[in-house]
Every structure is written in structure tokens, then in C-alpha cells.
């Protein structure tokens, strides 16, 4: 089901960032009639990641009674962290890998501001370099934030673009990067992969790798299977459609102590009950309410909880599993059957790996805190954690070492984990030769496959926030959204939208969300230019016949 698109409008005075063209999307009008006492409404949020915590926040701030059920022992979902014991008995931290908190993540930042109004718990990184095999590094430092000057300056400076390569670019197709209008652009590129889109552009090989490494692989996806519309939305969100820039912030310490534990305490102060270590098994109707069966993972212990509304804020596997185990959810009519089929079609991305190393010596001082790579085999990026995380800095100072993290995205089926682990370390030694003589005093290895793959299937077949069951809404980065948002920001945005849907359906006020501009920054000019070039090409082709 497609959400009703409302005309964005600027909100008075407040701006979530520096971009004057950021758009505010108001919530639906509250349902007519006398609104209920919000305290008489109870919502169960299934999932304590970004989407679930955002939905819980949006509901609780309007007085609704909220219960959060989270399968893991800590909040944060796929952006959680947890303690590990190092060989000397001290405590280190592990996570599922590096996450960039971009300045255009307006709705996620709104959540974080509840406990950190000035976002002091985030620190900026000065650059996001990308090292290409065979030499050459792209850098985003010092590039203007405002389009089109950011694009012009990046192309001028980047070794990925040269005059010969630029001459081969299809100008008509390239103008499509600027000629966008979301959500219509999502539909227009149904069936087109990221690789197809770049084929149309005729980008130079270096620039093609840059686009795929910076955008597509960060979605844990093979570019031949990843949506071209999503890739175009990312170009828009991070580069040609937003004036916030491509540089980003990172938490000053581990995700749990910096972000989610403070938010958990804030939610507790609003009356939210958070239960970790609880896995929801099925959702069913019980009169005019919904009932959820939940228990400890891998345990026969279970209990029922009733609610007036339910938010499913789960990863693809969790969402598919709960809906499949809840035969009546969504109703038995055609709309319900179609919705359940769409949920079953949500795809999981290939697996990814994270290797964190506690080394007995220092990485060279000039190494970037975070380095993306292209053409370095399975190695996609390298993080030197003591450059930005306090706990890693303290360990490095005390032991004269470094804490380094290696990522490998979109692993092929049947990957030999032992061979991959060895390969990643060897690639690190080639990139940072000073590490070849260092010893790992501790290692943490993680392989997961629970991220969403936004494929080339029709955009309208992806399940959205709204479901055929008015008491049930979805949230998460696997959920379709009309706006040009992605990853953590899609999770937060759909969390706010899910809360607003329930609130306004009960006659209570919602919150609304912000986004980068939903259309190109240059009005009709790119579209006119594209059509002009297309007409000229068609005329030339007829003349040559």
C-alpha cells in the first residue's frame, strides 16, 4: 500500500541542518472526533533498533503507553555494541562495524538530540578517502557542500575522472542525476540495477568503481542486484541534492554508552517499558486488540501481551518470520494476501564480515580514521578506531597499540571464512605496511546476513509503513519510503512515520519528518536539457538513415 504523499512545506524558524531547501513533511491530520486519553492506548514495538526506538519515542512523547520487545540483550539493533573481555582481563568493545552519521540524517539526529541537544557525543571526521588499487586516492575534504559546486570541484580534483573519460560520459543520462522527483523516480527505474544505471552513464572506469564502492557496496549488495533507483537516490541524498555535504560524524565512543543507553534511560523516563532478550513469535487478533506471543530466544518460555497497536520494526529475516508465523495478520481479503506476499518478497543482502584487531603496535599517524577501498579484493574499508572512539584510544594509549577494524561486504555464497579472514589481514598489510610486523593480541570476528537487499523488483511491491491492518504498522530500513532516505535515516524516518500513523489514526497529533529536497535543485533545467539532447539524437538518427 502506498502512503499518501503530502506537499512538503518549510517549517517556521527551525532548520535541522544548514540546507535551506530541506523539506518538512507534516504528519497526517488527526482523525476527526474527540481524541482519547493517550494513556489508555498501548502499543507494542517489536524491535529495539533505530526504527523501533524512534517509533517508541514518537508515541511516548504523545503520552501513549509503550512496550518495546527486543531480541538481543542490548538496544541499537544492527548499530548496537557490546563488551568483550581482552586477554589482560580488561574490557573492550565490539560492534557490527563502522557507521557514518551524515549531516543530512535529519530524523535520526532528531532522535539523538533528545538526550544530546547539541550532538556533542558525535565528532566530525575531516575526510572520507577512497584508496584505489594501483594508486590514487579520492578525497572529499575541502569540497564545497552546495550543489553543483561540490560535484564540479570533486570531478576537477578526482583522479577517477580524466578528460578522455569525461568525454565519453553520456550527458543525457548524466543529467538524470539532477532530474529527479521522488517518489516517482523510484518507479521510473523499476527493473534497472545500479550496474545498468552506470552503464547508461558511460562513467570512466575509475569513477564507476568510486560510485559502486561509496554507495552500492555500503548497502552490502552486488551492483548487478542492487536497485538503480536506490543508487540514484543516494547520489541525490549525499551529493547532488543536498547541501549538507558528504562528510559525516561518528560517535565519540561505543554505540551503547554513547547513543542507546542514554536513549533507553530517556524512554524509561517517559514511561516506556523496554524488555531485552524477548523474541516475538506470532501476532494475532484478539477482539478489537492485537496479541503478541513472545519469549526468550531458544526457550520454550513464552507469554502473551495485548496491545491497541503494534509496530514491527525488524530486520528482513525477523519481519518475514513473524508475518509467516501470523497467518491472520493483514486480513484474509485480497489486500491482506497481497501484503503478505510483498513481505515474503523482502530480500536479505549477502553476508558481510567484520574483523576487529587489537594490535601490539601503532598504525602510522598519517593514516585516515576511516578509509574506503576499491579494487583491494574483499577488503572494503579500514577503520583505525583509536582515532575517534574513546575506549579504543584509552586501550591504545595504555598498551602502545592500535585497534583496527576491517570490513568485507557482499560476500559470495559459500565463502571460506578462514581464508577470508587471512586475506583481509594480508590486504591490510599491503595497504598499511607498518602493520605487517605487528601482532594481534586479540581478535573479534563476525559474519552476519540480516541486512536488506533493495533489488530491482518493482518499487511498489516493497512493503511500506501502512498495512491493510490499521492497528499494525512497519518501520525499518527494509520498509519502503516515499522520501530520498537510506540506511539508518530510513530506519529513523519510517519509525517517525509509523508512530504518526497510529497517533493520527487515534485523533492525536503526529510529529512530521524532514528530508533532503525531494526534487532536483535546478528546477526544470536538467529535464529540458535531457529532452533537448534526446530530440537532437533522434533527429540525427533519422537524417543518417
Residue positions per predicted region:
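Mid-domain catalytic core of redox enzymes
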Residues: 2-19, 23, 39, 278-404, ...
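N-terminal Rossmann-like FAD-binding beta1-loop-alpha1 element of flavoenzymes
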Residues: 39-68
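Glycine-rich FAD pyrophosphate-binding loop
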Residues: 60-85
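FAD-binding beta-loop-beta segment adjacent to the flavin cofactor pocket
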Residues: 391-398, 448-482
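Active-site-proximal substrate-binding core of FAD-dependent oxidoreductases
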Residues: 501-545
Amino acid at each position: 500500500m502506498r502512503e499518501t504523499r503530502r506537499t512538503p512545506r518549510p517549517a517556521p524558524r527551525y532548520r535541522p541542518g544548514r540546507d535551506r531547501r530541506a523539506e518538512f513533511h507534516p504528519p497526517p491530520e488527526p482523525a476527526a472526533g474527540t481524541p482519547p486519553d493517550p494513556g489508555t492506548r498501548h502499543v507494542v514495538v517489536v524491535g529495539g533498533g533505530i526504527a523501533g526506538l524512534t517509533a517508541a519515542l514518537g508515541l511516548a512523547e504523545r503520552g501513549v503507553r509503550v512496550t518495546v520487545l527486543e531480541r538481543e540483550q542490548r538496544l541499537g539493533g544492527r548499530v548496537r555494541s557490546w563488551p568483550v573481555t581482552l586477554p589482560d582481563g580488561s574490557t573492550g568493545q565490539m560492534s557490527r562495524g563502522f557507521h557514518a552519521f551524515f549531516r543530512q540524517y535529519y530524523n535520526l539526529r532528531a532522535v539523538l538530540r533528545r538526550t544530546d541537544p547539541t550532538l556533542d557525543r558525535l565528532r566530525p571526521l575531516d575526510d572520507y578517502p577512497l584508496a584505489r588499487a594501483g594508486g590514487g586516492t579520492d578525497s572529499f575534504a575541502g569540497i564545497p557542500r552546495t550543489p553543483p559546486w561540490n560535484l564540479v570541484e570533486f570531478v576537477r580534483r578526482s583522479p577517477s575522472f580524466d578528460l578522455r573519460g569525461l568525454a565519453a560520459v553520456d550527458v543525457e543520462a548524466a543529467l538524470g542525476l539532477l532530474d529527479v522527483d521522488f517518489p516517482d523516480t523510484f518507479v521510473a527505474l523499476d527493473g534497472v540495477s545500479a550496474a545498468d544505471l552506470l552503464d547508461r552513464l558511460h562513467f570512466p572506469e575509475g569513477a564507476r568503481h568510486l560510485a559502486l564502492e561509496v554507495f552500492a557496496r555500503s548497502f552490502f549488495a552486488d551492483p548487478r542486484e542492487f536497485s538503480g533507483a536506490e543508487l540514484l537516490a543516494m547520489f541525490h541524498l549525499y551529493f547532488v541534492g543536498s547541501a549538507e555535504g558528504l562528510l559525516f560524524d561518528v560517535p565519540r565512543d561505543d554505540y551503547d554508552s554513547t547513543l542507546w543507553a542514554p536513549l533507553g534511560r530517556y524512554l524509561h523516563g517517559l514511561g516506556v517499558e523496554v524488555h531485552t532478550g524477548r523474541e516475538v513469535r506470532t501476532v494475532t487478533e484478539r477482539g478489537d486488540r492485537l496479541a503478541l506471543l513472545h519469549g526468550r530466544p531458544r526457550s520454550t518460555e513464552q507469554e502473551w501481551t495485548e496491545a491497541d497497536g503494534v509496530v514491527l520494526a525488524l530486520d528482513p529475516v525477523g519481519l518475514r518470520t513473524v508475518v509467516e508465523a501470523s497467518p491472520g495478520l493483514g486480513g484474509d481479503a485480497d489486500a491482506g494476501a497481497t501484503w503478505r506476499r510483498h513481505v515474503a518478497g523482502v530480500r536479505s543482502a549477502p553476508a558481510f564480515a567484520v574483523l576487529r584487531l587489537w594490535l601490539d603496535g601503532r598504525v602510522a599517524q598519517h593514516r585516515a580514521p576511516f578509509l574506503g577501498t576499491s579494487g583491494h579484493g574483499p577488503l572494503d574499508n579500514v577503520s583505525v578506531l583509536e582515532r575517534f572512539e574513546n575506549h579504543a584510544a584509552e586501550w591504545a594509549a595504555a598498551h602502545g597499540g592500535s585497534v583496527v577494524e576491517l570490513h568485507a561486504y557482499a560476500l559470495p555464497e559459500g565463502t571460506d571464512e578462514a581464508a577470508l579472514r587471512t586475506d583481509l589481514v594480508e590486504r591490510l598489510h599491503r595497504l598499511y605496511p607498518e602493520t605487517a610486523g605487528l601482532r594481534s593480541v586479540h581478535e573479534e570476528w563476525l559474519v552476519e546476513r540480516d541486512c536488506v537487499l533493495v533489488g530491482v523488483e518493482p518499487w511498489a511491491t516493497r512493503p511500506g509503513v501502512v498495512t491493510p491492518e490499521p492497528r499494525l504498522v512497519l518501520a525499518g530500513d527494509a520498509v519502503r519510503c516515499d522520501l530520498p532516505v537510506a540506511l539508518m535515516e530510513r530506519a529513523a524516518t519510517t519509525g517517525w512515520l509509523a508512530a504518526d500513523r497510529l497517533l493520527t489514526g487515534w485523533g492525536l497529533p503526529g510529529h512530521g519528518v524532514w528530508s533532503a529536497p525531494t526534487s532536483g535543485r535546478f528546477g526544470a533545467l536538467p529535464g529540458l536539457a535531457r529532452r533537448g539532447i534526446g530530440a537532437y539524437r533522434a533527429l540525427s538518427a533519422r537524417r543518417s538513415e
